[in-house]
Amino acid sequence: MKYTLTRVNTKNSISKKYPLRSLKKTSDPIKKQIKNNIFFGTISKYMQYIMNWGRKNSLWPYNFGLSCCYVEMVSAFTSIHDISRFGSEVLRTSPRQADFMVIAGTPFIKMAPVIQRLYDLMLEPKWVISMGSCANSGGMYDIYSVVQGVDKFLPVDIYIPGCPPRPEAYIHAITLLQKAISKERRPLSWIVGEQGVYKYNMLSEKEEKNKKRISIINIDSEDSF
């Protein structure tokens, strides 16, 4: 049995305010909202892909070096290696115009405030590559005047082993950084949330993979064999 609702006393003034001829069918607002979210979600996905594609293929390094590893870094800009194939041949003399910084060499304690200052002057998004054993862990300089790893005061994205590493290793680090950038999503630094604006706490790769590294270093006991 079907039931229908009819307006009572159609000649009343209420019917003039809500006449029958103005009634029309409307779509479900929930379904419409879901459709819009899927549509704009797809657009934002492609827009994010385009932004990451342009960003990873136009990485401008900051012209900054500390010691001998910088010579190997600059060698990658020669015609033999041709780093311009990866869109990273434009050296910037100002940190405000650079996309990433390469810590190539020994980070002395006296230079740590300068490196930190230059990193703070770089605009977001920005990345850091630690090049060489000295920048990674202090290298052979286990002394009071050398910082035992630049990740003590900077968030490092890519580590390049070697003393000194070859230019091919630096190019490999650029390709790894490009892969990491292609997977990033906004926001990268400052976040506008419900509780206000706050800065994203970026941890270094060394801190994030600390447990994994310790599990590899620890040797299994004899009972485990």
Curated annotation (Swiss-Prot):
PROSITE patterns on file: COMPLEX1_20K (PS01150)
UniProt lineage: Bacteria, Pseudomonadati, Pseudomonadota, Gammaproteobacteria, Enterobacterales
Name this polypeptide is given: NADH-quinone oxidoreductase subunit B
Pfam family, one: Oxidored_q6
Subcellular location: Cell membrane
Primary role: NDH-1 shuttles electrons from NADH, via FMN and iron-sulfur (Fe-S) centers, to quinones in the respiratory chain. The immediate electron acceptor for the enzyme in this species is believed to be ubiquinone. Couples the redox reaction to proton translocation (for every two electrons transferred, four hydrogen ions are translocated across the cytoplasmic membrane), and thus conserves the redox energy in a proton gradient.
Main subcellular location of this protein, as a coarse class: membrane
NCBIfam families: nuoB_fam, PRK06411.1
One MF annotation (Gene Ontology) recorded for this entry: iron ion binding
Topology versus the membrane: Peripheral membrane protein
Top-rank taxon: Bacteria
EC id: 7.1.1.-
